[in-house]
Amino acid sequence: MIPVNLNKPLTVQASQIQDYTMDVKLFGIVPFKQVDVHVVEGQRLIPAGVPVGIYIKTEGILVIAESDFEGLDRSRKEPARYLLRAGDYILKVDGVELEGKKQFTEQVAASEGKELCLTICRDGQIFDVTVTPQQNTEGVYKLGIWIRDNAQGVGTMTYLDEKNGFGALGHGINDTDTADLMEVQSGSLYKTKIVNIRKGISGTPGELTGVIDYKKENRIGAISINSVEGIFGTLSQEEADEIQGEALPVGLKQEVKKGEAQILSCLEEDGAPQLYTIEIKALHLDHDNINRGIEIQVTDERLLEKTGGIVQGMSGSPILQNGKIIGAVTHVFVNDPTRGYGIFIENMLSH
């Protein structure tokens, strides 16, 4: 039996790395509750802080909106109404898996108005719907839906582990129209160069502008997971060898303190990541939104001069404190670009 003071953090030394269930009793007698304990190995990660170009391909074709169009008879046509909705993923047409939206639009155009059986994934449920394409004023068969099959952008790599696994962004990639987390079939990281910085001001977030050349030789890694905690995958050995820096211990939530910390970020074309001073203003260990567990404020005059604070594209910049990697930058306050949020690194690692 271990006596516990609820006013102080508790650390338990375990002999093995595994899951445990602990019985909690009041006064050592009255059963109070059971607590699941996950014992993790002391992990070390290399803080990256480098900008990366991101390209992801969706699992199927994402429906971002349903609409009507004018038909040959000048009446409004809505073939997909009540059948498809924003957020649906079209996986197959007549049993044939889709490779991309070009293939899908070609199949619809070639349907000659015959029924198509679409295999749909909606909220994790897979089912079939039957829809009949109709002609627009130019005689082309349409379904009246807006679709997307990929997303691109610029972000920051957070860390690299000993097996060349990386984590980046600190939050998931959501569709700009539906706001839903995008289902990823595959994805890639590319080299990128920061060519411009738009400073943030109150009411208007700033932005890092990067140039991405999607040539094969510029591909530096594969993205396998897009989750609320960030994007994750494997970096090429060549690129991993270029990531400079010492592997640091992972700082768990209970080790993070309010006060001074640093973020590692790259703001210059062909420049190396630099450390910038911040202050941790508040900690939310059990925040409903795990991407907002750490509340930060930029205090480094160099960073304030360059960016005005936190800007888009800095998401994923690792947060360091007391020689440990403790989190990653995720969001900026719209009304105060010097302030923002971060995710605890242990939450990123739980993906």
Regions found by a protein language model. Give the residues of each.
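Beta-strand-enriched, solvent-exposed domains that form extended recognition/catalytic surfaces
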Residues: 1-31, 37
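A short glycine-leucine-enriched loop at secondary-structure breakpoints
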Residues: 75-89, 110, 308-313
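PDZ domains, with a preference for the canonical peptide-binding region formed by the helix
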Residues: 4-17, 92-125, 336-338, 343-347
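PDZ-domain C-terminal substructure recognizer with occasional recognition of PDZ-binding tails
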Residues: 25-42, 105-144
